[in-house]
Curated annotation (Swiss-Prot):
Its EC number is 7.2.2.20. Belongs to the ABC transporter superfamily. Zinc importer (TC 3.A.1.15.5) family. It is a peripheral membrane protein. Transmembrane segments: none annotated. This is Zinc import ATP-binding protein ZnuC. GO terms for molecular function: ABC-type zinc transporter activity; ATP binding; ATP hydrolysis activity; ATPase-coupled transmembrane transporter activity. Residues 6-221 form the ABC transporter domain.
Length: 269
């Protein structure tokens, strides 16, 4: 099945009769970064669970390369403040991992200095790096990163995005990255997929160029970030359902966008 690591074909998922995902097509190849964006309730978590094999779709197919190894970075990690868990002990919860391997993974992500510290005492940015290091310990062919920059300031986000790109280049792994932010995504992303229960559109992100103050403020970091501008030729009602109609026919709470503009090589789903 060509070079794909994972391929979703017309995937649909419903809960209690309510469609959460409909007709989703998605493929991730080695060395490719795919960023999934969309509002809360768009079905991003459901799609990730389908990719990971934790959820079987009601419709369609999820194909994975045989014996595919996946490294997963969760959106959040809650650790009880009274639990005596160091970063090292946390990483060694991965079967077969020794101290040297844990330290090497932390060095990869620039967090070797937190090896012996309590997990609860490290900063938000350090925690994200530890979670990324844990995902790398599996030597993954596919990295699945759920909100990898959550709780990190904008400058820290740029640094983490740049690190993810370097890891992709070093290991040649595919990357599926999830964000709820419809405006800020990686410039290194090969494909952006806009999801709102179905694939609204997909394509390459546009580079940040319209705001000189942003470039001046972040310098090199600004080149690691992109804003993906798009308008859809359809609208969604309050329940996320697609409405293909003129503005006069739309129910209250629905916005109509009469134009349809995408960046280069953008394909509408």
């Amino acid at each position: 099945m060509d070079n794909a690591l994972v391929r979703l074909t017309q995937v649909g998922v419903s809960f209690n009769g309510q469609a959460v995902l409909s007709d989703v097509d998605l493929a991730i190849e080695p060395g490719q970064i795919v960023t999934l964006i969309g509002p809360n309730g768009a079905g991003k978590t459901t799609l990730v669970r389908s990719v990971l094999g934790l959820l079987k779709p009601h419709v369609g197919e999820v194909w994975r390369r045989p014996r595919l190894t996946i490294g997963y970075m969760p959106q959040k990690l809650h650790v009880d403040a009274t639990l005596p868990l160091s970063v090292l002990r946390f990483l060694r919860l991965v079967p077969g991992v020794k101290r040297e391997q844990a330290l090497a993974a932390l060095r990869e992500v620039g967090a070797a200095h937190v090896l012996e510290r309590p997990l609860q005492s490290i900063s938000g940015g350090e925690l994200q790096r530890v979670l990324l290091a844990r995902a790398l310990l599996r030597k993954p062919e596919l990295l699945v990163l759920d909100e990898p920059v959550q709780g990190v300031d904008v400058a820290g986000q740029a640094e983490l995005y740049r690190l993810i790109g370097k890891l992709r280049d070093r290991y040649g792994c595919g990357v599926l990255m999830v964000s709820h932010d419809l405006h800020l995504v990686m410039s290194a992303t090969d494909q952006v997929v806009c999801l709102n229960r179905h694939v609204c559109c997909s394509g390459h992100p546009e580079q940040v160029s319209g705001d000189p103050a942003f470039v001046e403020l972040f310098g090199q970091d600004a080149r690691s970030l992109a804003i993906y501008h798009h308008h859809h030729d359809h609208a969604h009602d309050l329940h996320g359902e697609v409405v293909k109609a003129g503005p006069g026919a739309l129910p209250p709470g629905t916005r109509f966008t009469p134009v349809h503009k995408h960046g280069p090589d953008c394909n509408h789903g």
